[in-house]
């Protein structure tokens, strides 16, 4: 969906929650390399290294603080779109704060389902979305009712099995 939007000259920004860190494989995450090659597609993350729920040496407070920071950043980006003129093409190198056509907030539903951010605040974010913005929320194993009630489009990608369940680590090109 995001690459389709970029292909039509729209600006897209990916804000990832739950993923982050320095000096890790996540610094060279494949999607970041691909995004960097696409004009008009930008990204940032506000996650903590490791994945919430796994033994990564962090606690819920650290993950929650990062997730709440990500939600606050999402609010800023949504607000920036409210006043942006998105009817005409604009500089592909402009920062996301100048407004984007599509904002993808990766893993925000997972963060809400795990109690790292307040689900009501996520719902309020969706309700505050200006008409000129395509807002994409991902993550979670349970779709909150408000998503279905407020969304124009709902799709689902679900895990049937995962290599980590068999003790395999993350695989380059597949998971990062």
What are these regions (language model features)?
Residues 14-16, 103-108, 138:
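Short beta-strands and strand-loop turn motifs
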Residues 53-131:
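Phosphate-binding/switch loop-helix module in NTP-utilizing enzymes
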Residues 1-83:
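Conserved P-loop
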């Amino acid at each position: 969906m995001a690459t389709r939007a970029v292909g039509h000259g729209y600006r897209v920004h990916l804000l990832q929650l739950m993923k982050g860190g320095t000096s890790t494989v996540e610094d060279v995450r494949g999607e970041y390399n691909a995004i960097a090659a696409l004009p008009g597609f930008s990204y940032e993350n506000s996650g903590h290294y490791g994945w919430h729920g796994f033994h990564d040496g962090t606690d819920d407070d650290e993950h929650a603080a990062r997730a709440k920071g990500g939600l606050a950043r999402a609010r800023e980006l949504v607000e920036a779109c409210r006043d942006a003129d998105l009817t005409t093409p604009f500089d592909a190198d402009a920062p996301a704060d100048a407004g984007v056509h599509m904002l993808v907030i990766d893993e925000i539903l997972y963060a809400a389902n795990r109690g790292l951010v307040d689900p009501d605040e996520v719902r309020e974010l969706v309700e505050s979305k200006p008409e000129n913005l395509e807002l994409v929320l991902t993550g979670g194993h349970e779709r909150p009712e408000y998503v279905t009630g407020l969304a124009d489009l709902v799709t689902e990608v679900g895990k049937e099995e995962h290599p980590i369940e068999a003790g395999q680590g993350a695989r380059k090109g597949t998971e990062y």
